[in-house]
Amino acid sequence: MSDRAVYIEWVDSASTRGWGEHDDASLSVCHSVGWLVHKTKDILVISTSIGENNDSIDRLAIPRACIRKVRRVAVQKRGKR
């Protein structure tokens, strides 16, 4: 699965500080790009980097309930040097 680069638009929780009007609170729309390294019925997990042994670093788990759209990202692979 780690050969699939994706763009994910998703909604994150947001909080406010101090006193304010009730309608001042809003959600944050986030845009993330990474390698899809794991998925379940509840989450998608993307990573910034994939190692030679198919391990990964800097993983982000995004709840599917928060995801607005997922798009594949074309990646041009270069030959080994």
List PLM regions with ranges.
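Conserved RNA-binding domains used in RNP assembly and mRNA/RNA metabolism
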Residues: M1-R81
